[in-house]
Amino acid sequence: MLANPLSQFLIKPIIPLEALGYNISITNSAVAMIFVSIAASMLLITAFVNSKLVPSRWQAFGEILYESNIKLVHSIIGPQGKKFFPLILTLFLFISLGNILGMVPHAFTFTSHIIVTFSLAMIVFTTTLVYGIYRHKLGFFSLFLPKNIPLWLAPIMVIIELCVFISKPISLSLRLTANMVAGHILLKIIAWSIVSLTWLFKPLPIALVIVLIGFELFISILQAYIFTILSCVYLRDVVNLH
């Protein structure tokens, strides 16, 4: 009998804890996020502490990571986007390393849970909202009323633009979660199907799994990149009010 492909997404307590009647257990999801946070920090520290004129491999990797993200921020948001670079780099590292960690056998993919991806999306949403109001004051609300709109159409457009603005963190989080869940379920089903086959028919499915693992690793990086691109687009809208 094949194992339930959804069982890999179960959040399980590792260290049961309770305080004031609330469950604050340390779970496999929390451990995975802590591990990724430490790994991302160590990666940056290793890359940039004691940097040299002739870079080491880690320093070269860190410089590529830095330059690609700073160029992304500058090309989408503009010169004023430099202040958002730490946020964008952090999001990219956290999501990409979290996705890659999920490819390790028996590791937990925390980006497969909407509560995690929605929390990340809400960080971006809150940043855009707070910065937009701080920078433009009441002028921020002109974002919901496109220029040269007939007066009779204005109320409808305000409602539509407001709904689009509010739905951004929902679409941002759902896109990432759906891709991670779909890819892992497909891999799980094919991998478990190989077990029931005779040795004569196993080479082709095994080759397919290897190809899918490589593709899933690519998707893991791509989804982190898409998340950061869309985050930059949302930030650009409030920086330039369009």
UniProtKB/Swiss-Prot annotation:
Domain of life from the UniProt record: Bacteria
Bilayer-spanning residue ranges: 29-49, 84-104, 114-134, 140-160, 181-201, 206-226
Keyword Nucleotide-binding (UniProt): no
Protein's membrane topology: Multi-pass membrane protein
The entry's keywords: ATP synthesis, Cell inner membrane, Cell membrane, CF(0), Hydrogen ion transport, Ion transport, Membrane, Transmembrane, Transmembrane helix, Transport
Subcellular location: Cell inner membrane
Main location as per UniProt: membrane
PROSITE patterns registered for this protein in UniProt: ATPASE_A
GO cellular component, one term: plasma membrane
GO terms for MF: proton-transporting ATP synthase activity, rotational mechanism
Assembly behavior: F-type ATPases have 2 components, CF(1) - the catalytic core - and CF(0) - the membrane proton channel. CF(1) has five subunits: alpha(3), beta(3), gamma(1), delta(1), epsilon(1). CF(0) has three main subunits: a(1), b(2) and c(9-12). The alpha and beta chains form an alternating ring which encloses part of the gamma chain. CF(1) is attached to CF(0) by a central stalk formed by the gamma and epsilon chains, while a peripheral stalk is formed by the delta and b chains.
HAMAP family named among the record's database cross-references: ATP_synth_a_bact (MF_01393)
PANTHER family on file: ATP SYNTHASE SUBUNIT A (PTHR11410:SF0)
Assigned protein family: Belongs to the ATPase A chain family.
Its job: Key component of the proton channel; it plays a direct role in the translocation of protons across the membrane.
Designated name of the protein: ATP synthase subunit a
UniProt source species: Orientia tsutsugamushi (strain Ikeda) (Rickettsia tsutsugamushi)
Name of the gene this protein is made from: atpB
